[in-house]
């Protein structure tokens, strides 16, 4: 987001929509399939440089309000930029048919005043430091179960369902396998 290496932030985000909404077990919220757990935050009235790549297949980073659609290709880094003048939430999505999860790849950018951005940045740096400090930690079974449930709910339940029974044959049941 800037030229100061001390202020660099790297993170990923995942779809926030719970599997219960996807499988019509509960009512869908207003931004169904459009919310993420970790939105990109940028300051307004500054030129923001986006570096775009992929770890797996070709994707496309598309945010219509920024007039940006750039391919994300493994092994390549593409760049784009935008100047956002109004605070607000800007939504986009993957615009390249990239596989079975294509419909579950929203992009959320929150544009804020500079002071709010600085607060967000400090918070992200503190989160990164806290994660780094857990590298050698001895985790209790209870702590590991809590972390595992968070990951399963966020990542796995979309295919394997909240109850672990999956959608055979494409997504096998995890019940009784020792994996869940």
Question: For each of these PLM feature ranges, what is it?
Answer:
Residues 141-167, 175-180:
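Sequence/structural segment immediately N-terminal to covalent heme-attachment motifs in c-type
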Residues 95, 157, 172:
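Cys/His/Pro-rich metal-binding microdomains
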Residues 83, 106-113, 166-180:
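Gly/Gly-Pro-rich "capping" loops immediately C-terminal to redox-active cysteine motifs
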Residues 1-147:
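Non-transmembrane, membrane-proximal soluble domains of secreted or membrane proteins
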């Amino acid at each position: 987001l800037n030229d100061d290496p001390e202020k660099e932030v790297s993170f990923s985000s995942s779809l926030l929509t719970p599997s219960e909404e996807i499988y019509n077990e509960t009512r869908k919220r207003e931004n169904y399939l459009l919310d993420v757990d970790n939105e990109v935050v940028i300051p307004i009235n500054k030129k923001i440089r986006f570096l775009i790549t992929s770890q797996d297949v070709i994707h496309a980073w598309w945010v219509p309000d920024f007039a940006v659609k750039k391919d994300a290709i493994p092994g390549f880094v593409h760049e784009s930029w935008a100047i956002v003048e109004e605070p607000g939430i800007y939504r986009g999505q993957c615009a390249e048919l990239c596989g079975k999860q294509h419909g579950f790849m929203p992009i959320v950018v929150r544009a804020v005043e500079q002071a709010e951005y600085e607060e967000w940045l400090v918070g992200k740096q503190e989160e990164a430091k806290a994660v780094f400090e857990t590298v050698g930690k001895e985790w209790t079974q209870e702590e590991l179960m809590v972390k595992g449930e968070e990951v399963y709910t966020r990542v796995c339940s979309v295919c394997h369902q909240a109850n672990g029974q999956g959608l055979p044959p494409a997504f096998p049941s995890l019940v009784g396998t020792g994996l869940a």
